[in-house]
Structures are given as C-alpha cells and as structure tokens.
C-alpha cells in the first residue's frame, strides 16, 4: 500500500467528530477504493499516536481489535457512542457522514 493511501486514511479519521464512527469500507470509498476496507484496516494498525482510532469500526458496527476491543469500546462509551444490545455500535444513530 502506498504511503499516500495511508495518509489519506489518517486525514479522514482525524475529521471524524467525537461521538461518531465510520466504517473501514466507508473510509475506503471516500478515498476512491470501494473495495479497500482491508487496506484501511492495515493503515489503522499502523496509525500515528493521537489519531482517534477507536472511531473506525466494521460496517455492521462490530468492534475489532483483539485485545484492544475492550479499550475501543470504553473509549467510544466515553464519547457517548450508542451501542445495540448485542454490543455493536448503533450505526444508524452515529455513523459519520462527511
């Protein structure tokens, strides 16, 4: 993946407002790569410090991140992001639209 793609990912993620989330696929589409969700995931695994990484979730609102998933959920709860009863983010309520 080119560094310019990763920079584009980081630029978009930095714009997601507190209390909102975006999906990996949504970010990929914004960058003109509608099938680039995995590339967005790769970029997010290497994101710079200070980027609100917790605001990027799966399209269905599932939280990823292995051992970091509980940290991600806690950070989103602090931002008052709503969750469904099954533990997924309520994408209908808080999905960011640029």
Which residue stretches match the model-derived regions?
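Nucleic acid-binding interface residues in structured DNA/RNA-binding domains
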Residues: 1-98
